[in-house]
Amino acid sequence: MRLIDFISERDRYLSFPWMATAGLQLCGYTLYDVYLSPQRQLEVAQRMNQEFDADFSYPMDDGAIFVETLGLPLLKPEFDFPSVLENPVKTTKDLEELQVPNPYSDGRMPLNLKALELIATRIRKPLSLSIQGPFTLAVELVGATDFVRAIIRNPDFIEKVLDFTNQVVGDYARATVKAGTKFICISEPTAVILSPDRFEKMVAVRLRALYNSLGPGVWKVLHICGDTRVLLPHMLKCGAEGLSLDQVMDLSSIIKKFPKNMIILGNLDPIYVLRELSPEEVRAKTLELLRSMKGHSNYMFSFGCDCTPDTPLHNLRAAMEASRTRFVDL
């Protein structure tokens, strides 16, 4: 069954929210309390399912799994995602010192796979997962400034880095599918810096191969932050079944030109709306978004990006409750 078939013929829009670390507020754990325990991953996933009742199950997001397994130094806040402190890959020699991780034996990857197996078998909803994309991982390894310079000055080096990161992400993604992942979203936030031509050559070509390697039974989505209007024609041809778009994008105009067999996801503002407004205002903004999508069966409700760690839980509840409003009541 395709993703478009799964979401069609419903009496309401389905939801795939970007909850980030919200589950920590529910369970009182630090981030690495959860990352290091498949059982706690399951506990958080079950609590999130009870509290917010999305249409997919999901583990705690783990955008740092690749850089951490590759040995990059990280800043590790207790209640927010880790961030890279150094970008060590400046030459081909630096790159050759790294090895593609084995998802079944290296770092925390085996713990994540076990957590996915638990969630897939204990929660009776399709298991969704968001992972960092190969281009964004490459920029993390090299550093944004050096990466952009090398695109012009040393393109062969950049190609080697991208080939490496594509294998890292691909091997892990395929392992997560075997563990039970049904819906996989590849996040390429850094790709927004590229021109359409460079996006096609550096991102789209590799994504098509990666998505294809996951097999036909997996629902595939691409997320890129920011204003991606100039990239949309190429994003639509990346091999994904759906595109997740940022809150700066006008979905009501974009969806009119969107292929009917492609899903568009988004794009409630996680900053201005979810963090700053009252529950009543969040509910109103959610309903406003749903009404703007009315009549389009290829839409799924989501946030424009991850919500912040300090997002009030009552606002998340308000958004998710409103997102389940039936078409006849919009």
Language-model region placement:
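Active-site loop segments of alpha/beta catalytic cores
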Residues: M1-G23, Y29-Y32, D55, F79-F81, ...
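Active-site-flanking structural segment that lines cofactor/substrate pockets
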Residues: G23, T30-D53, S57
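Intrinsic-disorder/low-complexity, polar/charged segments
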Residues: S37-Q39, T91-D94, S278
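Glycine-rich, N-terminal phosphate-binding loop and its surrounding beta-alpha-beta segment
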Residues: A45-L74, P101
